[in-house]
């Protein structure tokens, strides 16, 4: 099934083979979501091979927590994940909509803003056995950037109250020429204007065309 907000941003989705991934969320569940999506990605690769679909041009995408997880899948070569879920077939590109790129800095932002009690969802996500510093070191995408990192398109609003725009800047500085950053002026966390949605659609379509023409 297509989640409506993704359907809205992908113009040529009828031409794509689309897989949706679910993952565990909630209090004290870290890092289950990361492991879930990496294992799900391998299942997708295996299914694509079985159905004789191309595995050379896979693009992973997600928004918010899903953006963070899409980046983790794309950068999983550098993630010490010792299990049968490892695969040599990596995504060709990642589309990241306002996902976390540096966990500790995002947590600090939430503590400083604190627009309501318990607004720091990152600390809620972490079990007692995993410190903020450890989680940030291992599960922050910017710490996993390497020479084989895929091309990434990031879409982020400058007025995001949950994942600050600075997170996109950090990734841009780390990925350099492997990164395209689409800044949505005054954009928040979801709920972009119709004009911004149109710009997002156009940029995603261009990014996909550039990705697939190679």
Regions found by a protein language model. Name each.
Residues 165-214:
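C-terminal catalytic histidine-bearing segment of alpha/beta-hydrolase fold enzymes
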Residues 105-144:
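Mobile cap/lid helix-loop segments that gate and shape the active-site cleft of serine hydrolases
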Residues 103, 159-163, 190-191:
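Acidic catalytic loop of the alpha/beta-hydrolase fold
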Residues 2, 6, 19-57, 194-199:
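Catalytic nucleophile-loop/oxyanion-hole region of alpha/beta-hydrolase
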Residues 148, 153-156, 160:
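Short beta-strand/loop motif that positions the catalytic acidic residue
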Residues 42-110:
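Primarily recognizes the serine-hydrolase "nucleophile elbow" in alpha/beta-hydrolase
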Residues 140-149, 166:
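Conserved serine/cysteine hydrolase catalytic core
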Residues 22-26, 100, 187-188:
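Short beta-to-alpha linker loops that shape the active-site pocket of alpha/beta-hydrolase fold enzymes
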């Amino acid at each position: 099934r297509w989640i409506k907000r993704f359907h809205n941003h992908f113009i040529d989705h009828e031409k794509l083979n689309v897989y949706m991934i679910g993952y565990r969320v909630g209090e004290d569940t870290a890092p289950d979501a990361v492991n879930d999506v990496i294992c799900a990605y391998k299942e997708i690769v295996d299914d694509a091979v079985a159905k004789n679909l191309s595995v050379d041009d896979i693009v992973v995408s997600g928004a918010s927590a899903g953006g963070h997880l899409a980046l983790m899948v794309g950068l999983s070569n550098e993630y010490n994940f010792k299990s049968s879920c490892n695969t040599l077939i990596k995504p060709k590109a990642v589309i990241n909509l306002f996902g976390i790129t540096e966990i500790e800095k995002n947590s600090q932002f939430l503590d400083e803003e604190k627009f309501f009690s318990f607004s720091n969802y990152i600390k809620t996500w972490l079990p007692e056995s995993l410190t903020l510093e450890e989680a940030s070191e291992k599960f922050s995408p910017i710490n996993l950037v390497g020479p084989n990192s895929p091309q990434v398109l990031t879409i982020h609003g400058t007025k995001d109250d949950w994942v600050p725009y600075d997170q996109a800047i950090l990734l841009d500085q780390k990925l350099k020429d492997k990164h395209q950053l689409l800044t949505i002026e005054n954009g928040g966390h979801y709920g972009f204007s119709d004009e911004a949605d149109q710009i997002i659609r156009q940029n995603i379509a261009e990014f996909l065309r550039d990705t697939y023409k190679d």
